[in-house]
């Protein structure tokens, strides 16, 4: 009986680790990239992300997965010189990522943010498959 409980706990731990949406996003950008980052979600009433360094890993903190993804995009653009766009969501990250020299925090006081214009829904979205939707969701998060 104890072995069953242990196996259940291990299974839950694996599922919880693999379920991180930002780590999955990193893997879609570049296979193996999630191992170069430490992702931390912290409760906060303010939308924010932080960039920090721990050893050879970049730490990205935020109050939810979307703000962590925004932090990832900020890091890639302003620290690593990697530009992701609506048409190109994959990149080859360097073996050793550029270090975050000084802890960096960005907050927003905007309560609402939006994406798309009213035409997008009629022109193209009706024809998207899951792969295309996944790319769009990634882009919205970044």
PLM region descriptions:
Residues 1-9:
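Sec-dependent signal peptide recognition
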Residues 9-17:
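Hydrophobic h-region of N-terminal signal peptides that target proteins for export
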Residues 35-39:
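A short, Trp-centered hydrophobic/proline-enriched beta-strand micro-motif
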Residues 21, 25, 31, 44-46, ...:
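Feature activates predominantly on carbohydrate-active enzymes
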Residues 1, 19-20:
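Absolute protein N-terminus
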